[in-house]
Amino acid sequence: MNKVFPNAAAACHDIHDGATLLVGGFGLCGVPNECIAAVRDLGAKNLTVVSNNAGTSTSGLVHLLNNRQVKKMMSSYVGENVVFEKQMLSGEIEVELIPQGTLSERIRAGGAGIPAFFTPTGVGTLVAEGKEVREFGGRRYVMERGITGEFALVRAFRGDRFGNLVFRKTSRN
């Protein structure tokens, strides 16, 4: 199977309303801006977006937020995106703030087929609210569910027809 597409629009063409997107990047590094623009132009809406953060007010996921295409954002950081902040504070967008390490582990677990795991991170805080908490070896842990996505948008330096990717510099996040 050839996984090379001629452009970002072709690569994103199957993304549909209500899809869950896992979006790479950290701050301004490694953000798949061309793919985000392609999703914006595609017009898919009611998206659940899982990403470390929402970028800034001028780049990254702001293009989907400006168009009101994002229904839910799962992120570890509100950051410097004023649009995201306003939508979050007004209740216009559903937001699940997740500790950064827990976010990474939830994505990893979901990809490995692990439906849930226990972590001490967040016990006794708002993060644990409404979640199962158990004690193991005298220590309390909160249960977190694995995250799976239908599509992943990443920025790579180079790729081959089998889907192997090479990342470079600070984009190796």
What is each model feature region?
Residues M1-N173:
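Conserved alpha/beta enzyme-core scaffold
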